């Protein structure tokens, strides 16, 4: 039963993890907007989510946990996703080699924040739906 519950929530969980990781990358781009030579980076969300979901199906990302007591419940933990960072090609490169376009970064940052909130709402809706089913006894 827990396997089915985990599978039902896994997609949203992985999407949230990748969105949070992308938010950090975009924040780093914004923070380094005035750093000479800084290369703007980003994550291809769709392809990275596919990779993470496939890796989970292959069960190659499972890490064994050590039980310190025989009364503990055996479990497995997934390794956190580490997305491949890609460099952005600038529309107008600056003279100092910095490729951060603040308008693009702000737009991407706001869009990613909105997508994160939508994923969180979808996950919350899934959990509420499951709770309703459990409480109704069906």
From Swiss-Prot:
A GO-annotated cellular component: bacterial-type flagellum basal body, rod
Function: Structural component of flagellum, the bacterial motility apparatus. Part of the rod structure of flagellar basal body.
GO biological process: bacterial-type flagellum-dependent cell motility; chemotaxis
Family: Belongs to the flagella basal body rod proteins family.
Protein known as: Flagellar basal body rod protein FlgB
Subcellular location: Bacterial flagellum basal body
Superkingdom in the source lineage: Bacteria
Quaternary structure annotation from Swiss-Prot or TrEMBL: The basal body constitutes a major portion of the flagellar organelle and consists of a number of rings mounted on a central rod. In Gram-negative bacteria, at least four rings, L, P, S and M are present, whereas Gram-positive bacteria lack the L and P rings. The rod consists of about 26 subunits of FlgG in the distal portion, and FlgB, FlgC and FlgF build up the proximal portion of the rod with about 6 subunits each.
Residue ranges crossing the lipid bilayer per the database entry: none
Entry keyword annotation includes Transferase: no
Key words of the record: Bacterial flagellum
Gene this chain is encoded by: flgB
InterPro entries in alphabetical order: Flag_bb_rod_N, Flagellar_basal_body_rod_CS, FlgB
Deletion phenotype: Strongly repressed swarming and swimming.
């Amino acid at each position: 039963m827990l396997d089915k519950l985990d599978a039902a929530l896994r997609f949203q969980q992985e999407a949230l993890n990748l969105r949070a990781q992308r938010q950090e990358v975009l924040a780093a781009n914004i923070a380094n907007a005035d750093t000479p030579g800084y290369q703007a980076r980003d994550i291809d969300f769709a392809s990275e989510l596919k990779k993470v979901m496939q890796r989970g199906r292959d069960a190659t990302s499972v890490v064994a946990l050590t039980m310190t007591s025989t009364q503990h419940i055996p479990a497995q933990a997934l390794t956190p996703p580490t997305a491949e960072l890609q460099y952005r090609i600038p529309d107008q490169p600056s003279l100092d080699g910095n490729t951060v376009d603040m308008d693009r970064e702000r737009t991407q940052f706001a869009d990613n924040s909105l997508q994160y909130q939508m994923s969180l709402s979808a996950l919350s809706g899934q959990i509420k739906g499951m709770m309703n089913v459990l409480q109704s006894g069906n």
